[in-house]
Amino acid sequence: MKINFFLKSTPINYQRQILIDFADKVGGNCIKSDGYEECDVAVIFGSWKKTPKKKWKLMLQHHFTKVNIVENHRDKPLIVIETPLLGRTITDNHEYHRVGLNHFMRGLADFKNENSPSDRFEKLGLKIKPWRKKGDHVLIVGQNMNDASLFGIDFSWWIKNTIQHLRRHTDRPIVFRDHPENKDLMKNLIDTYEWCNVSYSNEGTINSDLKNAHCTVAYT
């Protein structure tokens, strides 16, 4: 079986080293070219989009390398290494990663975690708090409007639809906390809903919004 690890699927040396170490352990091939090379199993690092929405990303070859690999490796196993979701910090040198078969997102990837033991989760040291039954407001948590997890959805439309849906079921105050990457892009939209007790929050940290929230709503 030929297993190719595509080093140029990421520009970050630390992540390339993960691919190199992985390849060494399983007897794989480290591919240094910008494009796809025929194999039985392909291994890449990071998510992909056919056309990055951020202009500066259009200049980065690794985005096009991954699209080329995905399109030419159809109907064969693709292993995708991506950033972690739990306990994630702002760094490129993560201690843990998610590894998906054929994709990187829940619902599309097979993470081979059905009936898996809890040892890896326990190593993260996360504590699950009891289900909250009290709280003052409903917190809507924003997402980076260019994030791959949105799969091209108009996030402004999702916010408007979500607010309208919530208002049919609750009269609690609604607080919208946006993703910091968006700056103030959503503020004008949220301000148009001020009449129905919807507010935009950008002060302090998200912890203050979570503290007294009755529940949270998020797209991903």
Can you name each region flagged by the protein language model?
Residues 81-153:
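A nucleotide-sugar donor-handling region in carbohydrate enzymes
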Residues 129-184:
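Active-site donor-nucleotide binding/catalytic segment of nucleotide-sugar enzymes
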Residues 11-17, 50-56, 88, 148-149, ...:
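Short, charged/polar "capping" segments at the starts of alpha-helices
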Residues 44, 203-220:
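A donor-sugar binding/catalytic signature common to diverse glycosyltransferases
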Residues 1-50, 146-147, 173:
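N-terminal pre-catalytic "stem/leader" segment of glycosyltransferase-like enzymes
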Residues 15-21, 56-68, 154-165:
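Well-ordered, non-membrane alpha-helical segments in soluble/globular domains
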Residues 5-10, 163-203:
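Catalytic donor nucleotide-activated moiety binding site of glycosyltransferases and closely related
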Residues 73-78:
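A short helix->loop->beta-strand "cap" motif at the edges of active sites that frequently abuts
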